[in-house]
């Protein structure tokens, strides 16, 4: 018969597990007086008690008065204990407390147990499981011990809240705790939250620790105007340490049953995710609905990278019906991209196949973007060395595909030489290049040249000074810089009216675009230029740490000749561009601000403007205010905040409001409250749909420590782009 040694430190382990969350008090440790009488059985099971009797003939001993039994990490405390040595069986009564080798504690008034096998049962009692997440505890009408690391609770309650705080508990007919497999399995389980039943599960399993396990996750609940009440019950498949899958049946009251699936994988040099959604016979739409999104990224050695991003939907209304943000619902073209990139010390190479799914079939075929099947790029990647001649090269070959209109391939070459001269007080960079465009076209039209080409030289001269002085603002020592900059660009005119337009457009004017060698974006035009950019920047740098506290910049382009290459075709006769100014400030008290202005002096008004203000005194305290204006198009406010309202209560909110149209574009608001063993979140949303209709949604999320989440508010509205603002006013870009 095996002996056993007393392990008194296991109670402390249970207390430490429950105290992992600082908001949860640790359970009180047991304190027992020293025993006066000690009995040691021949099998080295140690028993202490005030009194005991023993029958050598039957091998049965009885102990009374503060009894303590120890054996192989197990301890039993009681006022009465009967030990049958031949059967290795004990019967204990009156204030019985069993502590096993894992630190789990069971308290009852009756215990029958075979010590070697750990099989037996108790009467009504309570339990604390130190080896589980947060130190789970509860009570049961009967506790059955079915071997080491396996316990079955009958008509039981289970919670991870501290003693005396039954905020939530799982009420079950049968709960099996398999600590070797790290799984809790419940039959006929009800989740009660402050005594109110909120969910019923005929079957439920959950991990006892923080390790990933297969099984049902807690349901997600919500309601939207588009789909009505929502209930989703995810099932998680822990397939391997490096990949998993979640299958989610999602019931939508107005639409039917939708299936969602998320597959994730991770390797040493790769990672990816596949999302699938399928809704057979949408009750509102009257047809099958589906969506997919595949993302994959992989590296091959130190220089090669592959990226795959493919997505698609079944119909034009899918994003409108199921997208949870305005920017998603408003998409008209879904990008599809497969790319391989090489980045070496001298050259960078890229090969890409890309296309789009046009979500709205009403968009005319001639207004849809071209697919690039394929696109090849080659550029020099070495940084320019100062005070020496540097060869540069940019090359691109693209095959443009579309069902209608002109298609074909385009070759774009731009070899060049750069001579950067640099000194601490200034710089001067001269550059010459030759740009060559050549096409091989299909469906060019009767009499049109199917292999047009054009070549033009490019010359630029970019120079600036760095002037500085010491100054003080508000008693703070600062270095102020003054950085005048001139950029001259000359590109001769070449007739390009016969060239196709696959991807070229006019970008929004920005401070950086004042110094571009091509005022157009895309590769179909070599824009003629004879112009000079004059710009001035001043910075205020903190003498203490060198940090930039304030930056102001203004610039303008002066034209010495009319621009004859334009999109759309025509001649631009203006003698100067709009003024472009920007400012950025990092102020005391954790305040940051950024502003942009494009001023049209001919009309005496702003063409574009934006302003963003951010206050962030702590990581969990942030408030943003933004304003954006585009003449005749957009004037809107954007405000967001994440702020604690108390030690456990926090607010998250965002709203975008159109001043031009006097209406809300999109709003989110969420309140969250967390205690040591549960958290609750209420999330409400409202966004514009179809240009005129407001769509409302509400989601409820209850997170129970040790079980999971009951409901789940969509993460994207509150986590993606909500609490930060762009550095510059977004560009609308150019279209093809």
Q: Where on the chain are the PLM-derived regions?
A:
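N-terminal functional modules and adjacent low-complexity/disordered segments of proteins
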Residues: 5-6, 26, 42, 201
């Amino acid at each position: 018969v095996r002996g056993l040694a007393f392990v008194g430190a296991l109670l402390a382990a249970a207390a430490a597990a429950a105290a992992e969350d600082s908001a949860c008090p640790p359970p009180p440790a047991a304190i027992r007086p020293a025993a006066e009488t000690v009995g040691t059985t021949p099998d080295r099971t140690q028993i202490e008690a005030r009194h005991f009797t023993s029958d050598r003939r039957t091998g049965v001993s009885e102990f009374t008065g503060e009894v303590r039994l120890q054996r192989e990490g197990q301890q039993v405390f009681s006022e009465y204990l009967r030990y049958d040595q031949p059967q290795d069986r004990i019967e204990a009564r009156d204030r019985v407390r069993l502590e096993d080798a894992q630190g789990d504690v069971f308290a009852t008034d009756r215990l029958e147990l075979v010590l070697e096998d750990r099989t037996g049962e108790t009467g009504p009692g309570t339990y604390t499981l130190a080896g589980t997440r947060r130190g789970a505890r509860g009570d049961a009408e009967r506790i059955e011990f079915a071997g080491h690391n396996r316990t079955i609770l009958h008509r039981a309650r289970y919670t991870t809240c501290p003693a005396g705080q039954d905020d939530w508990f799982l009420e079950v007919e049968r709960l099996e705790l398999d600590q070797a497999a790290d799984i809790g399995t419940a039959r006929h389980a009800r989740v009660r939250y402050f005594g109110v039943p909120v969910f019923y599960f005929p079957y439920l399993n959950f991990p006892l620790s923080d390790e990933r396990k297969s099984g049902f996750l807690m349901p997600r609940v919500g309601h939207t105007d588009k789909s009505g009440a929502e209930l989703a019950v995810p099932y998680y498949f822990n397939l391997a340490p490096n990949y998993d899958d979640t299958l989610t049946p999602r019931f939508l009251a107005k639409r039917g049953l939708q299936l969602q699936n998320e597959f994730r994988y991770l390797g040493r040099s790769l990672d990816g995710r596949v999302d699938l959604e399928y809704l057979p016979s949408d009750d509102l739409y009257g047809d099958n609905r589906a969506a997919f999104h595949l993302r994959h990224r992989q590296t091959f050695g130190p220089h090669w990278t592959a990226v795959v991003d493919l997505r698609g939907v079944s119909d034009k209304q899918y994003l409108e019906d199921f997208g949870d943000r305005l920017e998603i619902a408003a998409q008209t073209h879904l990008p599809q991209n497969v790319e391989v990139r090489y980045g070496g010390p001298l050259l960078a190479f890229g090969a890409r196949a890309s296309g789009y799914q046009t979500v709205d079939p009403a968009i005319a075929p001639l207004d849809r973007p071209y697919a690039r099947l394929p696109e090849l790029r080659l550029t020099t990647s070495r940084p320019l060395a100062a005070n020496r001649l540097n060869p540069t090269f940019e090359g691109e070959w693209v095959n443009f595909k579309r069902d209608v209109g002109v298609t074909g391939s385009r070759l774009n070459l731009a070899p060049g030489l750069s001579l950067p001269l640099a000194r601490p007080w200034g710089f001067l960079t001269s550059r010459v290049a030759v740009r060559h465009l050549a096409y091989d076209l299909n469906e060019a039209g009767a009499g049109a040249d199917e292999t047009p080409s054009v070549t033009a030289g490019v010359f630029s001269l970019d120079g600036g000074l760095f002037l500085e002085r010491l100054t003080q603002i508000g008693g703070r020592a600062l270095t102020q810089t003054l950085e005048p900059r001139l950029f001259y660009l000359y590109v001769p005119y070449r007739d390009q009216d016969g060239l196709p337009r696959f991807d070229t457009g006019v970008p929004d004017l920005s401070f950086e675009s004042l110094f571009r060698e091509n005022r157009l974006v895309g590769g179909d035009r070599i824009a003629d230029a004879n112009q000079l950019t004059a710009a001035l920047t001043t910075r205020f740098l903190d003498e203490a740490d060198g940090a930039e506290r304030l930056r102001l910049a203004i610039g303008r382009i002066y034209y010495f000749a009319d621009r004859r290459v334009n999109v759309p075709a025509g001649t631009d006769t203006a003698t100067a561009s709009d003024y472009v100014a920007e400012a950025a400030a990092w102020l005391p008290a954790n305040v940051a601000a950024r502003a942009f202005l494009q001023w049209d002096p001919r009309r005496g008004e702003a063409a574009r403007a934006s302003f963003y203000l951010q206050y962030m005194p702590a990581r969990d305290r942030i408030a943003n205010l933004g304003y954006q204006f585009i003449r005749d198009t957009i004037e809107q406010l954007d405000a967001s905040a994440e702020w604690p309202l108390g030690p456990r209560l926090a607010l998250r909110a965002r709203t975008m409001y159109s001043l031009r149209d006097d209406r809300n574009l999109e709003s989110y608001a969420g309140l969250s409250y967390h205690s040591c063993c549960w958290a609750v979140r209420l999330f409400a949303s409202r966004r514009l749909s179809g240009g005129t209709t407001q769509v409302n949604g509400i989601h409820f999320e209850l997170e129970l420590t040790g079980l999971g989440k009951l409901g789940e508010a969509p993460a994207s509205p509150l986590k993606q782009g909500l609490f930060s603002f762009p550095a510059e006013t977004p560009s609308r870009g150019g279209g093809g």
